[in-house]
């Protein structure tokens, strides 16, 4: 199997982390991958906040129903958007930031780092909580948070059950 596909097929939401810290160099590699995501009209509307402070990660976890992994994460990346950068009258930044978030997940997997995508947008209470905690300006939309850490057990990277479903594929028309 090609190495790239292996990384995709074995990417999981990893919620239990070891104490090993992620290097600044690897965080930068992950952010570079995020910034190489496709964006409508090449507008690249994203901004990223890297959070490593353990107390802040704990506070951030309280904004989520399922954010319990954040206090033990090595880092979190908050993906934000500046909708004013849009060249179009519709919100293409949502797709752009989704692509950037997925690139973060895949780059982390390629580096042996576990990750979890925590949805923020369009949940107003989550956006408000993170905006207040992190000093994010009102004109910036908080899109997602990605929790990052080395898995406590390397076996967490396993190939999932085959989710391929030919019934969901339509050729030429529905």
Curated annotation (Swiss-Prot):
PANTHER family registered for this protein in UniProt: IODOTYROSINE DEIODINASE 1 (PTHR23026:SF90), NADPH NITROREDUCTASE (PTHR23026)
InterPro entries in the cross-refs: Nitroreductase, Nitroreductase-like, Nitroreductase/BluB, YdjA-like
EC number: 1.-.-.-
Molecular function via GO: oxidoreductase activity
Signal peptide: none
Name recorded for this polypeptide: Putative NADH dehydrogenase/NAD(P)H nitroreductase AF_2267
Key words of the record: Flavoprotein, FMN, NAD, NADP, Oxidoreductase
Protein biosynthesis among keywords: no
